[in-house]
């Protein structure tokens, strides 16, 4: 009887333990498999309340939107390193540093030194025009052509825009060296962009060659005001992606100017290391990362970047703490990084793979987390339909074995995976830098929403359950991958 009672108690305890692991992903997240016992302690340290506390520090403190090259980003990097040290991680940089400095050229302009006017009236001030990725100073008076183009560019004759200012909006991230622009030969280009990309300061790669023609950015509202003044439609440019090609030329002369100051600066990636327990394979490592930067302060406006990418940075910290708290440590090592300058074109992660602190050949996989704090939302898809969804990007296209491991880990978390954004975003976050080097990758992405690159990307409306569950998922993936080892890459299709 005693033996039977004891067996009953043991069985009951096991049922309760299994139930507890399933409850960890309760609510809209429905876990179907208990968390493996060897990973349970770390898993249970990941809590929504901590997600909220960490994110609040990144968003509402003195980090001022964490703009690359700005003091707020440096504060965030130092704080991030301090957190990692408290979780038992070691610095992975040169000479025991937590940082890998990335060299940049910082570009800056003052509102009084940029703008444009029609005739004698200066109707658009400097807050509406700003620095582009390939900015070059200019001052000129030119006739103007307005262009709205899709990814299927219109046919034009060579030199169509010769001697003209080209004001252009594209359905994709068009550059000055796009074949359409090169063929048109404009004298100067203004790219129409959302407000968050029109900056009075920016950083570029130190070796980046400026464009061969003067280029700048202009807000949608300012571009429409200019179009109206020059006889075109006042709603020619839209916040939505263009669906048809439109070209409108005017003989009206537009005076433009943009003066730029340049200086060399170093901006750090945060780099850390957690040694594996198995001496025979601890040189191999799982990489996990998120970009720490956002848009920062731009023309006296603060872009907080709660979702982009305070949420991913928060999840990475929670994952790090879980690794350290768990009694069973990873066999292989963990390289954990917070990247700078993702918003400037993945520059921090690109610099790392070009100047690795650990051999990239020893990296068995890379886990990237970016924008997992809000529910995807569009005019056709309400946020309420995406409480428990997340885009799983990269793994499906690169390694079936790795993809299956992620799916298996998710059975203990309960995300509903979506795959409809891969073509749109696969090359637009830091995992892409590693994928190009042949590393199996996975990218957790919550989807786009109306607050993307807006001053409204604050703590309001953040889904803390989604942040915590993203951390839980990648914690399990990391621990499982560190145990298993290398994954076969699929042949490119």
Regions found by a protein language model. Name each.
Residues 7-21:
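Bacterial N-terminal signal peptides
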Residues 34-35, 39, 125, 130-156, ...:
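Soluble metallo-hydrolase cores and metallopeptidase-like ectodomains found primarily
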Residues 37-45, 61-71, 146, 167-172, ...:
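Second-shell loop/turn segments in exported
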Residues 46, 50-53, 57, 71-75, ...:
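Extracytoplasmic/secreted proteins, especially bacterial periplasmic and envelope-associated proteins
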Residues 61-165, 176:
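Noncatalytic luminal/extracellular "stalk/propeptide" segments of secretory-pathway proteins
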Residues 124, 215-216, 223-225, 230-231, ...:
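Metal-dependent peptidase/peptidase-like ectodomains
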Residues 321, 449-493:
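His/Asp/Glu-rich mid-to-C-terminal helical/loop segments that flank catalytic regions of hydrolases
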């Amino acid at each position: 009887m005693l033996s039977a009672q004891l067996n009953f108690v043991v069985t009951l305890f096991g049922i309760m333990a299994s139930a507890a692991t399933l409850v960890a992903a309760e609510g809209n997240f429905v876990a179907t498999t208990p968390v493996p016992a060897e990973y349970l302690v770390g898993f249970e340290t990941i809590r929504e309340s901590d997600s909220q506390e960490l994110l609040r520090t990144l968003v509402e403190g003195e980090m001022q939107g964490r703009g690359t090259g700005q003091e707020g980003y440096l504060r965030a990097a130092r704080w991030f390193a301090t957190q990692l040290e408290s979780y038992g991680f070691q610095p992975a940089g040169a000479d025991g540093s937590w940082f890998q400095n990335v060299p940049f050229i910082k570009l800056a302009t003052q509102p009084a030194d940029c703008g444009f006017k029609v005739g004698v009236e200066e109707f658009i001030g400097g807050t509406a025009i700003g620095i582009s990725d390939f900015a070059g100073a200019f001052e000129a008076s030119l006739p103007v052509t307005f262009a709205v183009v899709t990814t299927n560019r219109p046919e034009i004759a060579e030199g169509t825009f010769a001697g003209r200012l080209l004001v252009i909006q594209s359905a994709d991230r068009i550059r000055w060296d796009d074949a359409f622009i090169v063929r048109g030969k404009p004298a100067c280009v203004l790219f129409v962009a959302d407000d968050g990309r029109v900056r009075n300061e920016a950083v570029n790669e130190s070796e980046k060659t400026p464009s061969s023609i003067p280029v700048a950015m202009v807000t949608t509202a300012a571009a429409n005001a200019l179009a109206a003044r020059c006889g075109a439609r006042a709603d020619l440019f839209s916040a939505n992606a263009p669906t048809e090609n439109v070209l409108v030329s005017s003989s009206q002369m537009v005076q433009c100017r943009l003066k730029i100051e340049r200086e060399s600066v170093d901006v750090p990636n945060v780099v850390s290391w957690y040694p594996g327990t198995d001496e025979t394979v601890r040189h191999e490592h799982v990489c996990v990362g998120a970009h720490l930067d956002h848009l920062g302060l731009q023309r006296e406006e603060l872009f907080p970047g709660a979702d982009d990418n305070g949420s991913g940075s928060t999840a990475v910290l929670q994952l790090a703490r879980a690794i350290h708290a768990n009694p069973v440590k990873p066999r292989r090592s963990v390289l954990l990084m917070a990247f700078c300058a993702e918003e400037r074109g993945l520059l921090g992660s690109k610099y790392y793979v070009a100047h690795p602190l650990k051999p990239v050949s020893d990296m068995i996989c890379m886990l990237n987390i970016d924008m997992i704090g809000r529910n995807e939302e569009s005019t056709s898809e309400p946020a309420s339909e995406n409480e428990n969804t997340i885009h799983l990007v990269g793994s499906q296209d690169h390694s079936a074995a790795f993809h299956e491991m992620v799916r298996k880990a998710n059975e203990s978390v309960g995300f509903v995976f979506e795959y409809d954004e891969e073509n749109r975003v696969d090359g637009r976050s830091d995992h892409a830098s590693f994928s190009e080097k042949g590393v199996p990758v996975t990218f957790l992405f919550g989807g786009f929403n109306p607050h993307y690159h807006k001053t409204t990307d604050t703590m309001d409306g953040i889904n803390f359950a989604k942040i915590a569950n993203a951390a839980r998922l990648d914690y399990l993936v990391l621990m499982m991958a560190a145990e298993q080892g290398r994954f076969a890459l699929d042949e490119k299709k």
